Amino acid sequence: MREKGWSPNPIDIICFTHFHADHISGLPGMLLTMGNAERTEPLLLIGPKGLTKVVASLRVIAPELPFEVKCIEITENAQTFSFEGFRLEAFRVNHNVLCYGYSMVIDRAGRFDKDRAMEQEIPMKFWSRLQKGETLEENGRVFTPDMVLGAERKGLKVTYSTDTRPTES
């Protein structure tokens, strides 16, 4: 990251697949780098059961940080976490230790239908907010996104899976 001139501070979530050293031993250095870059926002770590204990052990190297480190342990074979603007789907993979893969999914709303908005006499000042999913009210009349949006469009899904044997998905 440093070679590319990228700061780690925009990172809000780090997901761990499993606890082999080649997948987790870089965490103390990353935490210290974030602290040295004056990060103050909390950092969320997601991983298999035991994550809290593993992170506490690694924090011996990085005991004092100017930001909070939160841990979420995956408790099921498949688990979904919802965040603003996307969801994270964790799924169990076939490895010799408890191991997960992750899919980040960004859904997309339907296209804005200008003709439907005009037919229903929806004020133009509300169009962009309705398109963003807001429900609005004016003079006792309620305007909802489904009044002006078409069918949901295909979204974006990026999957990361490592250290796994072939398996049915």
Predicted regions and their residues:
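Active-site metal-binding loops of divalent metal-dependent hydrolases
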Residues: 19, 49-50, 162-164
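Phosphate- and divalent-cation-binding pockets in alpha/beta enzyme and binding domains
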Residues: 23-26, 53-55, 169
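Non-catalytic surface loops within mature trypsin-like serine protease
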Residues: 49, 75-76, 106-108
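A gly/proline- and charged-residue-enriched helix-loop-helix capping module
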Residues: 52-59, 74-76
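Charged mid-protein connector segments
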Residues: 64-67, 71-97
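Active-site-proximal loop/helix segment associated with metal-binding centers of metalloenzymes
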Residues: 84-169
